[in-house]
Every structure is written in structure tokens, then in C-alpha cells.
Swiss-Prot record:
It comes from the Bacteria. The gene is queA. GO terms for cellular component: cytoplasm. Disulfide bonds: none annotated. Pathway: tRNA modification; tRNA-queuosine biosynthesis. It comes from Haemophilus ducreyi (strain 35000HP / ATCC 700724). This is S-adenosylmethionine:tRNA ribosyltransferase-isomerase. InterPro entries: QueA, QueA_dom1, QueA_dom2, QueA_sf. The keyword S-adenosyl-L-methionine applies.
Amino acid sequence: MLVSDFHFNLPDELIARYPKDERTASRLLHLNGESGKFSDLHFSDLLDHINPGDLLIFNNTRVIPARLYGRKESGGKLEVLIERVLDEHHCLAHIRCSKAPKAGTKLILGEDKLGIGNGLEATMISRHDTLFELRFNATTPLFTLLQQAGHIPLPPYIDRPDEDFDQERYQTVYSKVLGAVAAPTAGLHFDNPMLDKLKAKGVNMAFVTLHVGAGTFQPVRVENILEHNMHAEYAEVTQAVVDQILATKAAGKRVIAVGTTSVRSIESAAQATQPTGKLIAPFFSDTNIFLYPGKTFKIVDVLITNFHLPESTLIMLVSAFAGYRHTMNAYQHAVQQKYRFFSYGDAMLINKNPNALNDLP
């Protein structure tokens, strides 16, 4: 199975660089995974496709202002993208600069927001492969410092500086647990009135946490996808969520994942539980689960997701869920119908293809 199997041509003008004025104003492409038929809807039509007793599972991670601009104490300019906060003063980060800093190098960060001479001071402690461990020298907790000095880390394909409105619109309305450096974008389409309507209809809701890392934007660098090393992200699935999933399955209702990060959290928990013979159990760990055509989904029945990058691990996940040909046909239709792509773009509603194992590249 080759990376090129998941290529499609995407005109640049279909990349959504700004969100719609209203969260629910996006379009929705409904793909029936079993038949391969699709229909063009609006996101507000989702209410007609979710039934009482179904369980919607959201990812409640909250994006941190993880991008910092600054300089080495010696003067060289640099850009820091925090990948993971380790504790109140330490983090792992990507650093872009002309020459990688050595251990002990002092960095001055955030002067563009805090003013010249008022920047945050950090020290490079050690290097871990492509990541740098930094210690921030202030007594103030790191999350607080980032709120003061950091920028919302918009994905590279949005290709513009972050603006004030991104602080709200690049977060889901239910985001709660700080830690992500990218938004779980399928959730961006939900506003509070829509959530209230779903609750009034008798739809159940649960929340997992997966802190989306910058690795989600990294290209697959091998031609044979079986050789790809998936990046790790931290995920939590609590006992309460497990109980809701088991009750939903027992009642013959559907588990609907909002976003690929919710899928990866739930299916990681199910995969880790396999040796015990249980369907699913609580999960608190890093996951590097890689779902591609030929892999099965033990829990998720329906997926709500945005349109993903060509040749990405996320379009591979969708292809595993809906079937390869059905997915690529739907993407071709989306391009022809000028759907908006990626984080601020439109969405898909996909019913799982029970025959996806027979629909491979």
C-alpha cells in the first residue's frame, strides 16, 4: 500500500484559511460507507441524522498558545512551537532557526507581545531527536506564561499570521483540558445551541481527551505506508466514558466519534483491552495507533470529520473506515463541488462500511 494511493489534486483556493461566520454554517458531505452513495447537506442537517440514544464522543482538549517568537541571547532569531508541556516550567518544543541551539543556550521569547526587554527567558536543557527540552526560568506556571506571550499555532497550510478571532474560533466550544497544539477540527462546527438541540433530542454525549500534537501535520515520509512510524499523542478515556459506550452498544444504538482524534482515543482503548477479552476499558497513556485500510474499528459506528490533506494518515484513517474507493470518490466529488478543506473547512458524516476490508487500494 503506497502513499501515492492516497493522493488527490486539491486547488489552492479550496483550502479554508478563515472560518465561516457561524460555526454551523459549514457544508456537510454525507457518505454512506456501505453503499458508497453521498449527499450534499449543511452541517445543521446533522440533527436529522443522529438518533435518540446515540452517543456522540467529543475530544475536549484545549489548544494552548504554543507558538513563541524570539531570539537567542546572542541575537539569532528563532521560532518555538511547544509540542508538550512536561510540568509547570519544562516543555518539549520544535525550534526553527538558522543554527540549532546547544544545551545551556538562553532564549528570549515573546518580546513581540510583552515588549522589548520584557521577554520570557528559557534555557535549552537537552535535545530529544527533533524536539528540544526547554526550562522556563520564571516562577509563573508555563500555561500562564503562554497565555501572555504565545500565539495560537495555526496549521502551516492556513498560511497567515494568527489573528485575535482565532483565539476563540480555533477552539471547540466545549474545550476544557489544556494541552493541544492543534484543534480537533471536526468539533469546531458545533455551537452551544446545536449541542442543546442534540441533548433535547435525547442524544447522549461523552468526552475523551487527546492532546493533538504538531505531528498531525507531518507528512508520511516513506512510500510504503506500512513502514510509517506514527507520532505519539497522550489520550484519556475514563471509566465513565467506557460505561457510556458499553450501555450504548447494549441498547443497540450507535457510537458516533466527532473527529479522528476521538476515533484514535476510543480505538486505542479498545485495542489495549483486547488481551483481556473485554470490549473496552479505561485508557490513560500515549497512543501511536495507525488506522489505515485493512485495519478494523471495534467501537466507532459513525464518524464526523473534516476533509484531510492528500497522502496524510488522516485520509488513510477515513479510507479504512469508509472503504478506499468510497473515500476517494467522495473526495473527488468534494473537490468538484468546491467544498472547503482542512481545519477551517467543511465536514463529512460517514457511516462505517462493514465491507471496508474488501475495499483496499
